A protein has these predicted regions:
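Short secondary-structure boundary segments
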Residues: 21, 102, 254
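N-terminal accessory/capping or targeting/presequence segment of soluble
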Residues: 1-93, 105, 109-244, 299, ...
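Long, K/E/R/D-enriched contiguous segments that form extended
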Residues: 280-346, 350-351
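Terminal amphipathic helices with adjacent charged low-complexity linkers/tails
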Residues: 116-135, 257-292
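Ligand-binding face of N-terminal immunoglobulin V-set domains in extracellular IgSF glycoproteins
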Residues: 98
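Acidic, metal-coordinating catalytic cores used for nucleic-acid/nucleotide bond scission
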Residues: 104-106, 256-257
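Loop/turn positions that initiate beta-strands
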Residues: 366-368
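Conserved catalytic alpha/beta cores of large enzymes that bind or transform nucleotide phosphates
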Residues: 223-277
């Protein structure tokens, strides 16, 4: 795969290519997991820099050991807090041309790691996708939570956002973070294996028109449940929608708006780069949310207590990492409200215990 990738450098006139762990929605549950395809690294955070004659993998302190085990044969491993990509690039006499997918980076994240020691070349057609068609499509539809279970209606949340726009004199706002769309519309889905956050984005205008971008078949269950005029579009229609919107300015989120979308919006509107106000709105929990958090903590605590009792009274010589992981989830499944684990269980025995975010598999599985 790496050699095939490097063969494309000449066509695009680049000296290297960047592959982050995240996907277009900045999710750690990347679909496709391009970083794993290239490097075999399976951790939740990381980034590869592929140059013509050398390959680098940057991870945080949790994953240095895991990265060496999974990717050390073909990659030079660096802890990103100690060595950044721009430090590697600064050693070259002439600035290298480094290609990247603008859908996978914000301006903030790219500049922090790479500038000023290279020339960045945006390539819209992802080079890994050209070599490997791996995206798994999820056919399950979105669903909306009952406002009684979350403590606030969608109408109320949208009104709060409209009031914010009015005070800040914002004509249009782009909510690019799926978790904020999820909060704003009380929306959930099945796009990610360990999270109910649906992959979607939205635009809200000061005239209260809402444009929701997602696969159209996924929104069939919610079309008539959002108390506002909603226009549903595929993501490929984004530029078409931008051109029909009115107003002079657009607010985008500096944390989650990719370079790709920022460029499309800036072709017609003056951009205000701010932090999405939904981050602030949702950080203040209402009484129902607080009660539900407490209830969830107690219910999960019951499952964990039963698990600890079980393991204390078991013959540990007969147990291994996978059996322990399965048993813990079985206790959690007894709760009628249980959906799935929020992250993979970390059950490491012996040397596996030194791998901070270890996940057992048939090959690595050890006795307890």
């Amino acid at each position: 795969m790496i050699n095939k990738l490097k063969q494309k450098f000449k066509r695009y006139e680049i000296d290297g290519y960047i592959i982050p762990k995240n996907d277009e929605f900045f999710s750690e549950y990347a679909n496709p997991n391009r970083l794993k395809i290239v490097s075999n690294f399976s951790g939740s955070a990381g980034m590869a820099l592929i140059l013509k004659d050398k390959n680098y993998l940057f991870v945080d302190g949790r994953y240095t050991l895991q990265a060496k085990l999974e990717s050390g044969k073909k990659f030079k491993i660096h802890e990103i807090t100690k060595v950044k990509p721009k430090q590697i690039l600064s050693k070259f006499k002439n600035k290298l041309k480094i290609g990247f997918d603008p859908k996978l980076f914000t301006n903030q994240s790219l500049k922090k790691q790479f500038l000023p020691h290279c020339n960045l070349i945006a390539i819209n057609d992802n080079l890994i996708d050209q070599l490997s068609i791996t995206k798994k499509l999820n056919g399950q539809k979105f669903y909306q939570l009952n406002s009684k279970d979350v403590g606030e209606t969608t109408r109320s949340k949208i009104s709060r956002l409209i009031n914010y726009m009015s005070k800040k004199k914002i004509d249009n706002i782009f909510i690019s973070a799926p978790e904020n769309v999820s909060w704003l519309l009380n929306l959930r889905g099945y796009d990610n294996p360990n999270s109910p956050i649906p992959n979607c984005r939205l635009i809200l205008s000061k005239s209260r028109e809402l444009y929701l971008f997602s696969s159209k078949y996924k929104i069939l269950n919610i079309r008539n449940k959002i108390p506002l005029k909603v226009n549903y579009y595929e993501e490929n229609d984004f530029y078409f929608v931008i051109n029909k919107l009115k107003g002079n300015n657009f607010s985008i989120d500096e944390i989650s708006c990719s370079i790709y979308f920022e460029k499309l919006i800036s072709s017609k509107f003056y951009i205000n780069t701010k932090v999405d106000p939904c981050y602030y709105f949702k950080s203040i929990k209402n009484v129902i949310e607080l009660n539900n958090m407490e209830k969830a903590h107690i219910e999960d605590g019951v499952a964990l207590t039963k698990f600890l009792y079980w393991i204390k009274n078991s013959d540990v010589k007969k147990l291994d990492e996978l059996k322990v992981e399965k048993k813990l989830e079985n206790f959690r499944k007894r709760n009628k409200n249980y959906l799935y684990p929020s992250f993979n269980t970390i059950a490491g025995s012996g040397p596996n215990g030194a791998i901070i975010h270890y996940r057992a598999n048939k090959k690595s599985n050890r006795k307890i």
